[in-house]
């Protein structure tokens, strides 16, 4: 009798566990179904098609340093998909007559909006020293990070004093003309960069200055003009 009652008790307990666990299991399956589809082989999947030098140049940059845990190619990171999003559907088989699903891309001629492109970048770079992108003049004018920066080259031209000005002059045509004047700062000669005076990420609203004001910025180089003067 005791054995029969015990067996019935276990049966009731088992049914209760199944009833409780069923919604949790269904919920877990639903969550799993909603997870983005990442490629199984990571960057190796991408390079089956994207094997040109312009793409493979990423391995000469800080974005692809396996020893750096914060790098997209660091241990346990998502490699290409850290920036370009889940590529499982994009890399999968495409039926005849269908277009390959797009993934986030960083250029002016893509379906990815400028705001979405920048959102991907600031997920990692928002903590950089002196970074105040949101609400800056460049942000307000829908300038993309990729509009200035080149991520797949060993030396990003906008980060080099000798080549930075040409990147800036693509948009700032008036400043290009001013740089030709005989009394201009030696920007064209590569002796100083635009960022010597300006902060493109928007620290100071006034003309994107590197200093707290026009004078403070100038005094970094022209300390002899700081004063005080005899007849002030």
Model-derived features with residue positions:
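N-terminal secretory signal peptides that target proteins for export/translocation
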Residues: 1-7
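Bacterial N-terminal signal peptides
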Residues: 11-22
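Short sequence/structural segments immediately N-terminal
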Residues: 25-232
């Amino acid at each position: 009798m005791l054995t029969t009652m015990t067996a019935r008790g276990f049966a009731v307990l088992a049914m209760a566990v199944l009833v409780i666990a069923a919604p949790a299991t269904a919920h877990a399956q639903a969550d799993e179904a909603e997870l983005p589809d990442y490629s199984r082989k990571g960057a190796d999947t991408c390079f089956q098609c994207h094997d040109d030098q312009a793409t493979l140049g990423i391995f000469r940059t800080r974005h692809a340093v396996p020893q750096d845990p914060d790098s997209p190619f660091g241990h346990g990171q998502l490699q290409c998909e850290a920036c370009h999003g889940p590529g499982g559907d994009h890399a999968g088989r495409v039926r005849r007559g269908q277009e390959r699903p797009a993934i986030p891309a960083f250029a002016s001629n893509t379906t990815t909006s400028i705001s979405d492109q920048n959102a991907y970048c600031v997920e990692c770079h928002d903590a950089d020293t002196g970074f105040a992108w949101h609400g800056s003049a460049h942000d307000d004018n829908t300038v993309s990070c990729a509009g200035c920066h080149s991520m797949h080259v060993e030396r990003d031209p906008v980060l080099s004093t000798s080549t930075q000005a040409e990147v800036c002059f693509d948009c700032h045509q008036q400043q290009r003309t001013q740089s030709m004047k005989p009394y201009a700062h030696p920007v064209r000669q590569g002796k100083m960069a635009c960022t010597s005076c300006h902060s493109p990420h928007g620290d100071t609203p006034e003309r994107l200055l590197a200093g707290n004001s026009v004078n403070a910025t100038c005094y970094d180089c022209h300390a002899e003009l700081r004063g005080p003067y005899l007849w002030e």
